[in-house]
Amino acid sequence: SVTAAPQEDEIPRADGDDAAATDTSALIWYRYGDEPMLAAERRTVSRLPNEPYETALLRLLLEGPSLDAPALRGLFPAGTRVISTSRQGEMLFVTLSYQLMNGYSDEPSNWRSDTAWAQEVPLRRRLAMQAIAATVTENTTAQQVVILLEQRGETTDSLRLRQKYYTLNAADDALADPLRRDESLLLTASGTMRTILTCIQQRDIRRLYRYLAQSDPDTGEARMEYEAFASKWTEYPALTAFDFSGGSASGTRAVFTVSGTRLADGVSQKFTCLLYTSPSPRDGATSR
């Protein structure tokens, strides 16, 4: 469902070590399928006595999405742990275990020579860090996140994460920049609408299909098979330009006013219509 970000006075605070154990609700950002995007799942964050809220929040992120969200995927190598978190004003310092630098279990050894994997491997690392930034900024007042890395006997002048995490170049020892929220990677209500309209404009039918609901939320009718969907799509006019506004949330949907031009039988036509997105980890980020 579309869920508004928490207001500042609703954000749990855990700056002291004497905080009591508590359960709170939070939006945790995970990868949406194989897409280069993140989608949020609302989860219950169980905080242990004296555990900072930010630590519990990121622990849940690293564990991966729940079984109720089959469309979402975790982003961190096996064994990666949150060792500690510390707030300094609007900056959150996060220390992660050394496993962060490990490869993923499904990465082929020759990934650099494979065109698809050569794009996928760096993308995973970028999305993993953005998942941290998005989850932290969504649920706390922190604006930036600095990642520190557990050291295992190495001699170094800083615990800061290095650029080689992103570039996968062992010689790239420059310090990584603090993480900031990047809305272009997030399937918020507006982000989902923009992605879907872009798919329509580019006639990327296979990708568009991944953003359709598994079933109609109003009627319960199941999504048609891809072959039928792709065949039917050839009947529709081409979308040549679009813009949208609104995004007011109501219940389980966010409604947008979409305008633009479409090309039908060689004739350009202007149009305006209402569309809505209904991001749901059960069905994926969806649109009608």
Which residues fall in each region the model found?
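Bimodal "functional hotspot" detector
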Residues: 1-282, 288
